């Protein structure tokens, strides 16, 4: 029995990067032998075990064969006679199909096992598929795109790009389950350059199948005096990259991605203006979130940002009453942390424009000041003075907040 570290751990070590995850393959062993060494079985489709001390995952070497369309249609074979190279050949990219032996004390020993030229592709900064079996798993398209967001200087090898296009044309991505699509998109959004993920998906045609709402933004013009980059799709990519550069949360990055969906449906005769695109963005965003089963916290923030980002940009022109109405519509008084993230997404929107990446955004500070003042109003005390009159209580609290905001930010009621 031999144990090998495989995949990303070897790749990242060769690149001089911190190793995020460690995966192990066991060659020449049976499930019974693993159990005898106190490894705990956890795999459903094939034997995966947890180490008794470190709780890291160890998988028996296996081969796999495509039996049906989509992500789940595979038949696995595992036995002591499956070799390391047979296990590595089923992997997606050459840079992920390398291994090193692990000694009994856990140290990596011996040379890098690299049967498919992964080290050469690392040096050339190429994503290249291991073999023809790449086409059997449509998730690999999403994974290549996600890796592009992490390793932004890498390019997809031409033959790999051709295979990805063929998979899309064959309808393979249409069989992906929503949870897996969201998982890969979310992971890609959290990488350093998420725009690269969407570029790769767009180049192979997968973006139009997976996120047609985003694909439709490319080529839609905006006013050059507000958006020197002009193209709405380019703008959205700049916004998500700015959000990534600031280290914002997944919810903020998703809101940044989806805030302008409605611009794709602007009537051609009014372009490049986009009056009312905020409402159309909300109408497109709701079914998108339902289709991909987007988590509630991401969906809810994205809806606030899509609906209100135009108003957030205009707060320097607002009086206190309009500011309070905006805070109330955004539910900022009950959910100040979410509103803080809405301001981050709005600032990313303002700075995701060509030549305006460092432009000041005083709107955020004004809204923070307004929210502090509005939340300082003692609604309970006002309610006690007007017991039994709900309509009057609501109006009195609103007016008190308007007065507080007017005083705090120095604007008229």
From Swiss-Prot:
Gene Ontology biological process terms in this record: RNA repair; tRNA 3'-terminal CCA addition
Record keyword Transferase present: yes
Cofactor binding: number and manner: Magnesium is required for nucleotidyltransferase activity.
Cystine connections: none
Reactions catalysed according to its record: a tRNA precursor + 2 CTP + ATP = a tRNA with a 3' CCA end + 3 diphosphate; a tRNA with a 3' CCA end + 2 CTP + ATP = a tRNA with a 3' CCACCA end + 3 diphosphate
Residues where Mg(2+) binds: 21, 23
Enzyme nomenclature, EC number: 2.7.7.72, 3.1.3.-, 3.1.4.-
Keywords: ATP-binding, Hydrolase, Magnesium, Metal-binding, Multifunctional enzyme, Nickel, Nucleotide-binding, Nucleotidyltransferase, RNA repair, RNA-binding, Transferase, tRNA processing
Pfam families the record matches: HD, PolyA_pol, PolyA_pol_RNAbd
A GO molecular-function descriptor: CCA tRNA nucleotidyltransferase activity
UniProt: ATP binding residues: 8, 11, 91, 143, 146
Binding-site residues for CTP, renumbered to this chain: 8, 11, 91, 143, 146
Cofactor(s) named in the record: Mg(2+); Ni(2+)
HD domain segment(s): 232-333
Alphabetical list of HAMAP family matching this protein: CCA_bact_type1 (MF_01261), CCA_bact_type2 (MF_01262)
Functional summary from the UniProt entry: Catalyzes the addition and repair of the essential 3'-terminal CCA sequence in tRNAs without using a nucleic acid template. Adds these three nucleotides in the order of C, C, and A to the tRNA nucleotide-73, using CTP and ATP as substrates and producing inorganic pyrophosphate. tRNA 3'-terminal CCA addition is required both for tRNA processing and repair. Also involved in tRNA surveillance by mediating tandem CCA addition to generate a CCACCA at the 3' terminus of unstable tRNAs. While stable tRNAs receive only 3'-terminal CCA, unstable tRNAs are marked with CCACCA and rapidly degraded.
Protein family membership: Belongs to the tRNA nucleotidyltransferase/poly(A) polymerase family. Bacterial CCA-adding enzyme type 1 subfamily.
Recorded domain comment: Comprises two domains: an N-terminal domain containing the nucleotidyltransferase activity and a C-terminal HD domain associated with both phosphodiesterase and phosphatase activities.
Subunit annotation: Monomer. Can also form homodimers and oligomers.
Misc: A single active site specifically recognizes both ATP and CTP and is responsible for their addition.
Descriptive protein name: Multifunctional CCA protein
Gene of this entry: cca
């Amino acid at each position: 029995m031999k144990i090998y570290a495989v995949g990303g751990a070897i790749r990242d070590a060769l690149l001089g990067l911190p190793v995020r995850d460690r995966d192990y393959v066991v060659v020449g062993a049976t499930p019974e032998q693993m159990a005898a060494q106190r490894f705990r079985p956890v795999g459903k489709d094939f034997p995966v075990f947890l180490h008794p001390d470190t709780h890291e995952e160890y998988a028996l070497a296996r081969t796999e064969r495509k039996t049906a369309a989509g992500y789940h249609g595979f038949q696995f074979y595992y036995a002591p006679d499956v070799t390391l190279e047979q296990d590595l050949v089923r992997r997606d990219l050459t840079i992920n199909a390398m291994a090193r032996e692990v000694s009994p004390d856990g140290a990596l020993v011996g040379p890098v096992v690299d049967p498919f030229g992964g080290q050469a592709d690392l040096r050339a900064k190429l994503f290249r598929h291991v073999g023809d079996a790449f086409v059997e798993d449509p998730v690999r398209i999403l994974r290549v795109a996600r890796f592009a967001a992490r390793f932004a200087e890498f390019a997809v090898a031409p033959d790999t790009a051709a295979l990805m296009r063929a998979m899309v044309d064959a309808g393979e991505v249409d069989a992906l389950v929503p949870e897996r699509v969201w998982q890969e998109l979310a992971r890609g959004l959290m990488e350093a350059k998420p725009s690269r993920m969407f570029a790769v998906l767009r180049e192979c045609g997968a973006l139009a199948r997976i996120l047609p709402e985003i694909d439709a933004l490319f080529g839609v013009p905006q006013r050059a005096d507000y958006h020197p980059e002009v193209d709405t799709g380019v703008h959205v990519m700049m916004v998500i990259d700015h959000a990534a550069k600031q280290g914002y949360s997944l919810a903020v990055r998703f809101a940044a991605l989806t805030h302008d969906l409605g611009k794709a449906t602007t009537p051609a005769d009014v372009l490049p203006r986009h009056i009312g695109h905020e409402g159309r963005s909300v109408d497109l965003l709701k079914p998108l979130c339902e289709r991909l089963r987007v988590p509630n916290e991401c969906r809810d923030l994205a809806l606030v940002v899509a609906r209100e980002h135009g108003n957030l940009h205009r707060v320097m022109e607002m009086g206190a009453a309009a500011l309070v109405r905006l805070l109330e519509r955004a539910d900022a008084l009950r959910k100040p942390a979410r509103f803080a993230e809405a301001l981050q997404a709005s600032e990313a929107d303002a700075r995701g424009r060509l030549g305006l990446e460092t432009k000041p955004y005083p709107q955020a500070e004004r809204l923070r000041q307004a929210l502090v003042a509005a939340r300082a109003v003692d609604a309970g005390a006002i309610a006690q003075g007007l017991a039994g009159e709900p309509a009057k209580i609501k109006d009195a609290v609103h007016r008190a907040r308007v007065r507080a905001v007017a005083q705090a930010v120095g604007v008229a009621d």
